[in-house]
Every structure is written in C-alpha cells, then in structure tokens.
UniProtKB/Swiss-Prot annotation:
Keyword Mitochondrion recorded: no
UniProt keywords, alphabetically: Carboxypeptidase, Disulfide bond, Glycoprotein, Hydrolase, Protease, Secreted, Signal, Zymogen
Propeptide: 287-316
Protein name: Serine carboxypeptidase 24
Enzyme nomenclature, EC number: 3.4.16.6
A Pfam short name: Peptidase_S10
Length: 465
C-alpha cells in the first residue's frame, strides 16, 4: 500500500516536469536571493525557498541553491549536499561550516567568504531534510515522530523531481550527491531511488553520475566494532573497557544489554575526558560541555551503540554562530524562510527527530554493491581524527564488500605534504584525509576541495608533491 502511494506521488511529480509552464520561471525568480544580510558582494546567483513534497500532510522541504562562482556556471554540474544526524541541517553544517561560499562570524552579524568553497567547481544545492529539520516543516505533527530512512529517501526524490520543474535549466545536467555522517544512509538510499526511477526513461531528467560520502555511517555491526577499536588504538579508553565492550556488546542486535550499556557509559563518562569526539586532537570549545549536558549526548537510545553515538552536535561553537544568524528575522525574509510562522526557533539539529527516528537500515553494503555494479562513481572518504564515525569503522565495513583492488593503497599529496591515503577498488574509491575530523571540509578545507575536484574529474588523488 505504501509503495503504491509512493508511485502515485512520483507520477504526480513527473507530470509537473513533463508539462512545464511559464510559472516555473516565475517561481524560480520568486526564490531568488537578492542579498543576504551582512553578505559580501558576489557575482553568483542564489535561490532559496520551499518545495512541497506531500500535499495532504503539508510537508515542505527548504533548499538553498548557491550557483557556481565560475565564469560559466551553466557548464558546471549540480551537487546536492545532505547532512546527517539524523535530523541535522545541511544549511547549518554543509553550507555554513564546510563547503558553502560563506562563513558566519562569531556574533552572527556578518558573513565572510570561504576561500575553499565547492561552488568554484559546482552548483551547490543544500537541502534541509526530512521535514522538521531547520526551516523544513510539516503541518502533520505525527510526521515528526515517525520519520525514518525510507520516507526521507522518498521525500528527497520527490523534492528533486519537483525542484527540477522549477529549475528546468538543471534537467539533464550532470548530477552528484554528497554528504557525511548519517548521510551515509541518506546519500546511497537516495542514489538507489534515483537509479530505480531512471530505469523507466531513456533520457532521465536526473542525470545521476555518482556520489561521495564522508565519515559515513555504513553498517551497524562493523561500524560499531571499528569505532570501539579506534577508541582503544588511540588510547582514549582502557584495555579493560575495550575488552568489556567487546565481551558484553552484541552489535548484531537492535537493543543493547544493560552490561553493554554500562561498559560503554563507563568508558565515555570516566575515560574519554572532555575531548571533542568529532576531532580528538583539537581544543574543545567552552560551549561544548554545555551542549553535551543540554542535548542528552549520553541518553540511552532505543537502538544500538551506533545510534547512541550519533546524537547531534558537531562543533558546538560554529553551530551556535549559525543559530544566531538563521534565527534573525531579516535573514529569514531574505531567504524566503519560515513563511508559515513556525512557532519554534531554527536549530542546527532537531532533538525530536533524533530521539524518535523509526526505520534505520542496519547496513548500506547491499546498496553499495548494487550501485558500484551500475557504473556510478562512488567515493567514500574519512577524516582520520573523528572518533564518532572513525576511519576504522568505514574500513571494517567496506572490507566486507570484497571488491577487487584496482590501485593499491598509496599516500596522496597536497602542498608537499601527505594529504591522506587512498585505495581504488572496482566501482568504489576510498580515501582518508589526514588531520581532519568528522566534518572534513571544516577541518581540512583545502584537502577536501582537492579531493572533490579529483572526484568530479574521475581521476585518482595526486601522487606527487
């Protein structure tokens, strides 16, 4: 029944793209951002607004498009960026801290340019998804308590189809998806939806070429084993805690036992210390401890250890700058946001969605196998100082794909220094970024940009100085 309803929604969305009207140009122009408050002068165009993905429930997703700053943006691909959580904003993180053209100052009063913005090479589309994240909303309150992987992927596909109707110049354009963390679910799940959808057309409007994901949640069992191993090998936890967690935690089941819960809680509360778990070698922010206490970082979730680790919060300092800026009424007017007068404040992550997330696939490995065989370009990258979804977790998970190696492990270089390490498999490339935390473009922006350019070009990462 649910599948039939989804197919019906796709047909409705498809009809709106098959018979474009003059209203598309009017809708597009209505979404144009003339200038953001405190924004430096730029030559590229920006648009933002809402796309309704479910009329009966009143679910609408908010987007922000920053076109390429290159002299010929019409020749550049379109990149959709998704952040994870689940329940965290791509505008708060991807756009404002990582790959977007602007950074927010500490007071939330002004913007300044990001020297390593990815819109030098692509048109960037940031989507706040699912409904309930950031400015995205639903008129059906129960939607906030039964969100999950499947509906998020469905809504994101419907968004894309309808958005392309509003922006027909992007139909058939080379299209890529990127993201990080729990977007390790969102990105491949959406890629599969698009791949399946495109099979019905000889020339599909969504010209999906590939995707890349950083510090990606991939497989509950292997990710969890790899994470605990990272904690121990990086001297964050004791031998005793490491052995206790491996002894008492069964990472193949949905619910953790009390013994497992106690072992993990002891390690995190008594051995970790006050470190930034998303970047273990960088200083913590004063606000970090406050964030930990107020968001329930250590609350017991209903799922696995993995879910317990994913309660929100990247860098709490930069996150607070975004919350100051995007709650400003003049910013919301400029972005055509909060047009329905949402009663709650814009936040970087939704606690409600995080705590009530319903369906979460245990593994992405079957999707990776399918899409790797389909010819899509797939890159997985890991910042190597992240202890939340660490490099060992990703390597443990990817090793179970058993893909043939095309290019053996080697160091790649930037500015006469090792930028990380990489190995190329048949259908998939894996790369590390040296010195980067959970949000790779935040901690190592230049290396992240070089990685992105190599991905777009379909070339291996540079071997030379």
């Amino acid at each position: 029944m649910a599948r039939t309803h989804f197919i019906f929604l796709l047909l409705v969305a498809l009809l709106s793209t098959t018979f474009p009207s003059s209203s598309s140009s009017r809708e597009q122009e209505k979404d144009r951002i003339k200038a953001l408050p405190g924004q430096p002068k730029v030559a590229f165009s920006q648009y933002s607004g809402y796309v309704n993905v479910n009329q009966s429930h009143g679910r609408a997703l908010f987007y922000w498009l920053t076109e390429s700053s290159s002299p010929s943006p019409h020749t550049k691909p379109l990149l959709l960026w998704l952040n994870g959580g689940p329940g965290c904003s791509s505008i708060a993180y991807g756009a404002s801290e990582e790959i977007g053209p602007f950074r927010i100052n500490k007071t939330g009063s002004n913007l300044y340019l990001n020297k390593f913005a990815w819109n030098k090479d692509a048109n960037l589309l940031f989507l706040e998804s699912p409904a309930g994240v950031g400015y995205s909303y639903t008129n059906t309150s129960s939607d906030l308590k039964d969100s999950g992987d499947e509906r998020t992927a469905q809504d994101n596909l419907i968004f894309l189809i309808k958005w392309l109707s509003r922006f027909p110049q992007y139909k058939y354009r080379d299209f890529y998806i990127a993201g990080e963390s729990y977007a390790g679910h969102y990105v491949p799940q959406l890629a599969k939806k698009i791949n399946d959808y495109n099979k019905a057309f000889s020339k599909p409007i969504i010209n999906l070429k590939g995707f890349l994901v950083g510090n990606a949640v991939t497989d509950n069992q292997y990710d969890s084993i790899g994470t605990v191993t990272y904690w121990w090998t990086h001297a964050i936890i004791s031998d005793k805690s490491y052995k206790s967690i491996l002894k008492y935690c069964n990472f193949t089941v949905e619910r953790v036992s009390d013994d497992c819960d106690n072992a993990v809680n002891y390690a995190m509360n008594h051995e970790f210390g006050d470190i930034d778990q998303y970047s273990i070698y960088t200083p913590t922010c004063v606000a970090a401890q406050q964030k930990k206490n107020t968001t329930g970082f250590f609350v017991r979730m209903k799922n696995t250890l993995l879910r317990r680790r994913l309660v929100s919060g990247y860098d709490p300092c930069t996150e607070s700058y975004a919350e100051k800026y995007f709650n400003r009424p003049d910013v919301q007017r400029a972005m055509h946001a909060n047009v329905t007068g949402i009663r709650y404040k814009w936040t970087a992550c939704s606690d409600v969605l995080i705590k009530t997330w319903k369906d979460s696939d245990k593994t992405m490995l079957p999707i990776y196998k399918e899409l790797a065989a389909s010819g899509l370009r797939i890159w997985i990258f890991s910042g190597d100082t992240d202890s939340v979804v660490p490099v060992t977790a990703t390597r443990f998970s990817l090793s179970h794909l058993n893909l043939p190696v095309k290019t053996r492990w080697y160091p790649w270089y930037t500015d006469n220094q090792v930028g990380g390490w990489t190995e190329v498999y048949k259908g998939l490339t894996f790369a590390t970024v040296r010195g980067a935390g959970h949000e790779v473009p935040l901690f190592e922006p230049k290396r992240a940009l070089i990685l992105f350019r190599s991905f777009l070009a379909g070339k291996e990462l540079p071997r030379s100085y």
